[in-house]
């Protein structure tokens, strides 16, 4: 069912959050911020949490329950509401049905889904595929771009094929335990060891000697059997938001900069999970203090990076600004939407307030529809 068939009524937006990934808590926090900022005059919001075990739960949508409180991370549980399912059958028209007891009862019907899921089993094309099967429009990238954007190896392959600047890296698939001599020489030290399909800096280690690599690889593999090792790049950390509008045009936001080195004991400059979400230790400059020509070049690169993976809807593109120019580091197809997250802050600094930003994403999803495009 589309919003246009219910003229004069509010659009029903299902905000889906939580999920099975190790970024479950950050997804909850992002959803809380979105629930506070979706315009209630335009949207009827349905809040659906996914437990760490994968159960879908219809919740009351209370944003306060989705906040980090005294360093305690929020979590969806089966007691958070009524368990439900979205049938992968377009004939159901976006209806959400209860699971036993009362199996099959229609609990709600939605016009569009806002999948605020970070990491595997959500941001990686899986829920996007379900929504395509179910015939329900959704905010953000499609199946291919979501999968490619989640996997750092394939993101970099697509960027390299498009002639975009990326840093040295090597990939360890599950059958490989260590880097070879050529890779070690090419990457040098220090280096960063990361789960290939993760985010929020979870499982990431900075190594300053090759002796530290085995432990760092093991730490990353607790989150993903595939690991990527990246050369450390000496440069300022810049970010840029890309937003698609209902008419298909793309715009890049004002830039933001993350500064961690020397902040509250973080002389290594490593923007890890605790620095991001628990300690509030990073300094964020929005807009970033860069020359206009540099900002323009980074914004153009952000849109090229977005297009190179066939992205849709939105993305945050992360850069290092080196003496030789910008280098693209990562792209997030569903960036954080917490109160400290750079993506909404950069758009606010660009003159797009938070409710308008969210409304644009929903309108773009409805304009795009589903299926091949």
Swiss-Prot record:
Keyword set, alphabetical order: ATP-binding, Cell shape, Cell wall biogenesis/degradation, Cytoplasm, Ligase, Magnesium, Manganese, Metal-binding, Nucleotide-binding, Peptidoglycan synthesis
Binding site for Mg(2+) 1: 318, 330
InterPro entries: ATP-grasp, ATP_grasp_subdomain_1, D-Ala_lig_Van_CS, D_ala_D_ala, Dala_Dala_lig_C, Dala_Dala_lig_N, PreATP-grasp_dom_sf
GO biological process, one term: peptidoglycan biosynthetic process
Amino-acid positions noted as binding ATP in the UniProt annotation, renumbered to this chain: 184-239
Localization per Swiss-Prot or TrEMBL: Cytoplasm
A GO CC term attached to the entry: cytosol
Lineage top rank: taxon: Bacteria
Pathway: Cell wall biogenesis; peptidoglycan biosynthesis
Cofactor: Mg(2+); Mn(2+)
Reactions catalysed, as given in the entry: 2 D-alanine + ATP = D-alanyl-D-alanine + ADP + phosphate + H(+)
E.C. numbers: 6.3.2.4
Residues in ATP-grasp domain copies: 156-363
PANTHER family: D-ALANINE--D-ALANINE LIGASE, D-ALANINE--D-ALANINE LIGASE A
Function: Cell wall formation.
Family named by the database record: Belongs to the D-alanine--D-alanine ligase family.
Protein name per its UniProtKB record: D-alanine--D-alanine ligase
Source organism (scientific name): Mycobacterium ulcerans (strain Agy99)
Taxonomic path: Bacteria, Bacillati, Actinomycetota, Actinomycetes, Mycobacteriales
């Amino acid at each position: 069912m589309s919003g246009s068939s219910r003229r004069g009524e509010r659009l029903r937006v299902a905000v889906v959050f939580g999920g099975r990934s190790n970024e479950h808590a950050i997804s909850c926090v992002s959803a809380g911020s979105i629930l506070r900022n979706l315009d209630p005059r335009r949207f009827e919001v349905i809040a659906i949490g996914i437990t760490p075990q994968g159960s879908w739960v219809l919740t009351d949508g209370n944003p306060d329950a989705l906040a980090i409180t005294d360093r305690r991370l929020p979590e969806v549980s089966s007691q958070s509401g009524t368990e439900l399912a979205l049938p992968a059958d377009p004939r159901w028209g976006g209806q959400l049905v209860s699971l036993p007891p009362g199996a099959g009862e229609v609990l709600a019907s939605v016009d569009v889904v806002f999948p605020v899921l970070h990491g595997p089993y959500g941001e990686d094309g899986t829920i996007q595929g379900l929504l395509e099967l179910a015939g329900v429009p959704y905010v953000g990238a499609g199946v291919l771009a979501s999968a490619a954007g989640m996997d750092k190896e394939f993101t970099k392959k697509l960027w390299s094929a498009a002639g975009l600047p990326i840093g040295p890296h090597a990939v360890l698939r599950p059958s490989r335990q260590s880097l070879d001599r050529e890779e070690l020489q090419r990457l040098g030290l220090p280096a960063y060891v990361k789960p290939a399909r993760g985010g929020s800096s979870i499982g990431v280690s900075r190594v300053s000697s090759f002796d530290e690599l085995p432990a760092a690889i093991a730490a990353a593999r607790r989150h993903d059997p595939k690991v990527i090792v990246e050369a450390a790049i000496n440069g300022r950390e810049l970010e840029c938001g890309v937003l698609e509008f209902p008419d298909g045009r793309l715009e890049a936001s004002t830039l933001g900069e993350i500064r961690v080195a020397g902040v509250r004991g973080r002389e290594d400059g490593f923007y890890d999970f605790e620095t991001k979400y628990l300690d509030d230790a990073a300094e964020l400059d929005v807009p970033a203090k860069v020359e206009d020509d540099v900002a323009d070049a980074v914004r153009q690169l952000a849109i090229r990076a977005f297009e190179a993976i066939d992205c849709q809807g939105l993305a945050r593109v992360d850069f290092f600004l080196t003496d030789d120019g910008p280098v693209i580091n990562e792209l997030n197809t569903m960036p954080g939407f917490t109160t400290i997250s750079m993506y909404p802050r950069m758009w606010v600094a660009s003159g797009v307030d938070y409710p308008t930003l969210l409304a644009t994403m929903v309108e773009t999803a409805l304009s795009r529809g589903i299926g091949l495009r």
